[in-house]
A protein has these predicted regions:
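Transmembrane helix-loop junctions in multipass membrane proteins, especially transporters and channels
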Residues: 23-31, 77-81, 106
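Interfacial loop-to-transmembrane junctions
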Residues: 93-118
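Core segments of transmembrane alpha-helices
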Residues: 14, 57-71
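Membrane interfacial helix-start motif at the N-side
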Residues: 42-63, 100, 106
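Cytosolic, membrane-interface loops and tails of multi-pass inner-membrane proteins
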Residues: 24-52
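Structural signal for membrane-spanning alpha-helices in multi-pass inner-membrane proteins
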Residues: 19-26, 72-73, 101, 120-127
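Helix-coil boundary and interhelical linker segments in multi-pass alpha-helical membrane proteins
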Residues: 1-7, 70-85, 122-128
Length: 128
């Protein structure tokens, strides 16, 4: 399997990582909260709330990234190393995005989000 395809798997686990951060950093998540974790997550504020928002955004961004990687892989017009580099850069941008969200660096977070979007578009461009 290529690095770019492995990046799809890595991207899939970024959202659950954010959920874990939200629950653990709240300091009050217990077994009873696991019966309705969405209701629990809606009560959060501060860092745990931002981690939950990063989780939601990670789920929203995942389908476009996965589709872009798969299109590039199937079409086969782009060099594999190009696809792999774009995949690693995207994962890096998502990690930076999560860090910016957790740190409440809103302006930088938006810039990093746009960089991630540009990387998704890049998969299609190099595949044309």
């Amino acid at each position: 399997m290529t690095v770019a395809l492995w990046c799809i798997l890595i991207a899939l686990f970024l959202a659950p990582l954010c959920a874990l951060i939200a629950k653990v950093s709240s300091g009050r998540f217990g077994l009873k909260d696991n019966h309705d974790p969405r209701a629990f997550l809606d009560t959060l504020s501060g860092l745990p709330r931002r981690a939950h928002a990063a989780q939601q955004n990670s789920y929203e961004a995942f389908p476009a990234f996965a589709a872009a990687v798969l299109v590039a892989d199937i079409v086969g017009n782009a060099e594999q190393v190009t696809q792999d580099v774009l995949g690693v850069m995207y994962i890096t941008s998502r990690l930076l995005y999560i860090i910016c969200y957790l740190a409440d660096w809103a302006a930088l977070r938006s810039l990093v989000w746009f960089a991630g979007l540009a990387l998704i578009v890049s998969f299609f461009v190099v595949s044309a």
